[in-house]
A protein has these predicted regions:
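Short, flexible helix-loop junctions that flank or precede catalytic/ligand sites
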Residues: 1-365
Length: 365
């Protein structure tokens, strides 16, 4: 039942439905039509959790838990088990068996500059399933090949397994190796890493220690579940009380190096999905906007629009290029755009493949 292919991103086990897989963003049958019962999903959950007492306790007390699962000789999975209507439901994210190659992911050339950074914070953001972990793994792998550093990762759970190459790479997993991101990150400052990957900046304490690490000469890589660069800054600032936000903005402006946001969009030819990427880079202009806050005519999006020569790009510009190159169709591209009405105007010279949608205008307001 756990056989996978390169096109499958997730597996779903839910009472009342046959097993399902997600292929290129859409659910499809997993090869059997037998409907799962509550007892079926309970047994599957029990097998996946095994003797992980922390996961067992979380499922009982909090109604959900996260575990990693390895299928011998095949794939690894990041598993979330949760209660719904009194029964277990399971989502298994497929983790490829090999670390993704930077060039194979077709990441923007600008992101190669991260490999040479000596300090600061790099954030990769996007919704669940947008490829954040793959991008970070590819960056870590390139650092592992080209630098001679101590690299430390703190993950929940560990996804891609890195072997020592030119670097020494230590990977710590939440709950089995450390009780929290914040404690592991604090300990990391005494473990002499040059590069620290924090799986997610979930809380105020983790953000504060990440900033401290960046300010004391470490390169910190992490993720946030935000949709673009502007929302990322506001999310971080919003974690802190008003009395601390001015100081926080100042520290963040000085520490951030890149904010990379991703969306995976179905390709026009049906051959999977393509990563649409937004890049906000630390420049004099963007540091000012982060520190002082965005105002009319002085937004991070404005900075990205005029910052192409500095290596920046914004979602809608990236989507426009893919539409013009025939990688995306117009309807799909507009559905994933930040400002679909504006993008539709930019594409007005192309043959109309979709009718103008009045909802595109209202979605921007």
């Amino acid at each position: 039942m756990l056989k996978t292919s390169s096109k499958i991103s997730d597996l779903f086990f839910s009472p009342g439905k046959p097993p399902l897989v997600e292929v290129s963003g859409k659910l499809a049958p997993a090869g059997t039509t037998r409907v799962l019962s509550s007892e079926d999903t309970r047994r599957i959950a029990t097998d996946l959790v095994g003797q992980n007492q922390h996961a067992i306790d979380n499922l009982k007390q909090l109604g959900s838990c996260d575990v990693s699962y390895c299928l011998p000789g095949a794939h690894r999975f990041r598993v979330n088990i949760f209660m719904q209507r009194g029964s277990c439901a399971i989502v298994m994210r497929v983790i490829p068996g090999t670390v993704p190659d930077f060039d194979a992911l077709n990441l923007p050339v600008e992101l190669k500059k991260i490999i040479g950074l000596r300090n600061g914070i790099v954030l990769v953001t996007g919704p669940t399933g947008s490829g954040k972990s793959s991008t970070l793994a590819a960056i870590i792998d390139r650092i592992n090949k080209e630098q001679s550093y101590h690299v430390l990762t703190i993950e929940d759970p560990i996804e891609f397994l890195h072997v020592h190459k030119n670097c020494v790479v230590h990977q710590r997993e939440l709950h089995s190796d450390t009780p929290s991101f914040a404690l592991a990150l604090r300990a990391a400052l005494r473990q002499a890493p040059k590069v620290i990957l924090v799986g997610e900046m979930r809380d105020k304490e983790t953000i504060e220690i990440a900033l401290e690490a960046a300010e004391t000469g470490h390169l910190v890589l992490s993720t946030l579940h935000t949709i673009d660069a502007s929302k990322t800054v506001e999310r971080i600032v919003g974690v802190f009380p008003m009395s601390e936000q001015h100081t926080l903005r100042n520290r963040l402006a000085k520490s951030f190096r890149y904010i990379i946001s991703q969306r995976l969009v179905p390709r026009k030819d049906g051959a999977g999905r393509v990563a649409v990427i937004e890049i906000l880079k630390s420049t004099l202009r963007t540091r000012e906007y982060v520190e002082k806050g965005e105002t009319d005519g002085k937004t991070l999006l404005d900075a990205m629009r005029v910052g192409e020569q500095e290596g920046m790009q914004h979602f809608d510009g990236n989507i426009e290029r893919f539409i013009r190159e025939g990688v995306l169709d117009m309807e799909t591209g507009l559905a994933y755009a930040t400002n679909p009405g504006n993008l539709q105007l930019e594409l007005s010279d192309l043959p109309k493949s979709v009718e103008p949608d009045p909802l595109l205008e209202t979605s921007e307001k």
